[in-house]
């Protein structure tokens, strides 16, 4: 007879053997509809006993695989995002496929190609090319064309057809400067990352705005460098020679570099110069002095990003560009103090 009737006979045999309806057998084969684990096991056992091939569609395929692409995990803020994203993805019933970039070796694009080859169901980008005004955006357009849903974290250019979830950099910088102003500081400097990256650009704009509002300073002291300890230490001298009594940094790593450079120059933190970090990463409450810093709401950001991505995976809805901003808190510790004339 035809293959259709052969298939029907097979279904009937399996149903009889497993003592379930043919509809249930069909659900197990097609992976569609609700089947209890016990029933699925009965059907699979019947298939094995009758010598038929098990369905290719194993139940695991209903678990979404979510790619997470981050910069290097040596920076504690990215480790924090990785940890929280992994938890949120697992909590939503998915599997996180973490990929971190290694400078000069594996790029965001390499990771992306490998995830697409692994039939990933959705992707979360953290602080990648999406946040770079000089970055090539073709990779994101390619994902949109392939209908692979993705979301971004911490800054995205408006051309990218995906929602971005980020820390309110403007609110964070305003809180830091406001705190220093209350302590009597006026010559406040901002040390941040490269301004072609969205969060740095937002920090710089907010800093210029509040320095103008509070002190009528139109060209405040700023320095742009990498988000590393060494780069920050190297940039510190210029700011201090220019008379800064307080430095707001774009990351905790930068703040630690600034504190080291100030100490090497024989200055005390916070007696001579106040320093504010940004991120409130692990161990910043244990530094000496304990670091006053802007705390990124990592948990709120990751939960919202994961929930939005899972909704898109489940509904095949097309995502569009939206900016979701989560305001940070200023955590006041011991690296800031009232201004003393130098």
Identify the residue ranges that each predicted region occupies:
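Hinge/beta->alpha junction and helix N-cap segments in small-molecule ligand-binding domains
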Residues: 38, 70-80, 98-107, 129-132, ...
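Glycine-rich phosphate/diphosphate-binding loops that line cofactor/substrate pockets in enzymes
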Residues: 177-188
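Alpha-helical recognition/docking segments in bacterial nutrient-uptake
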Residues: 2-6, 53, 63-178
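Flexible loop/turn connectors
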Residues: 217, 238-342
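N-terminal helix-turn-helix DNA-binding module of bacterial transcription factors
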Residues: 1-63, 340-342
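Short beta-strand segments enriched in small/hydrophobic residues
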Residues: 22-26, 59-74, 187-193
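Short acidic/polar active-site loop segments enriched in Thr and Asp
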Residues: 21, 121, 186-187, 245
